[in-house]
């Protein structure tokens, strides 16, 4: 599909972390096999660093240093990007990622997957201040976050609203 030959491949890059262990192991095993079969180097890539680095392609004017907020269904991190390959995670979710919170909330509200954009559209229609929800801040952790309480609160609110016919 890519229109290239095996001889065009100079190396194989693969995510080694973070991620669901089963998916990471399958990806690593496949990538190692391909690299070995082709006789090319295997390049391990940190999943979140890859997301951040992809922005250099999309925004060529982007130059370190800067702070990056990396949010997905499985990870939420605040990253200090000092140089193109020098990055430090300053804070991360302690449990559920922000994206997982959005996806689960969207599902219980009958919204499509992934839930980020539909939840954003729904929130923009709200007058605000209707519900008191927990914050993602973790006591004693300057930049770490926790989204499990928020996710549970939204799910409980949605179930309660369904029970009372709201």
Stretch-by-stretch model annotation:
Residues 1-10, 162-163:
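Phosphate/pyrophosphate-binding loops at sites that engage ATP/ADP/AMP, CoA/4′-phosphopantetheine
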Residues 7-10, 38-41, 61-67, 74-76, ...:
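Short coil/turn connectors at secondary-structure junctions
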Residues 14-38:
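Short Gly/Thr/Asp-enriched flexible loops that form oxyanion-binding sites at enzyme active sites
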């Amino acid at each position: 599909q890519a229109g290239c030959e095996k001889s065009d491949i100079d190396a194989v890059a693969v995510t080694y972390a973070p991620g669901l262990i089963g998916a990471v192991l399958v990806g690593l095993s496949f990538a190692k096999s391909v690299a070995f079969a082709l006789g090319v180097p295997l390049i391990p890539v940190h999943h979140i660093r890859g997301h951040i680095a992809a922005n250099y392609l999309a925004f060529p004017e982007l130059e370190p240093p800067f702070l990056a907020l990396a949010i997905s269904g499985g990870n939420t991190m605040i990253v200090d990007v000092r140089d193109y390959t020098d990055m430090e995670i300053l804070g991360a979710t302690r449990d559920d990622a922000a994206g997982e919170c959005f996806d689960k909330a969207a599902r219980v509200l009958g919204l499509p997957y992934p839930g980020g954009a539909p939840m954003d559209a729904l929130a923009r229609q709200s007058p605000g201040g209707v519900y008191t929800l927990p914050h993602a801040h973790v006591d004693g952790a300057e930049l770490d976050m926790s989204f499990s309480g928020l996710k549970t609160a939204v799910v409980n609110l949605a179930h309660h609203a369904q029970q009372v016919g709201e």
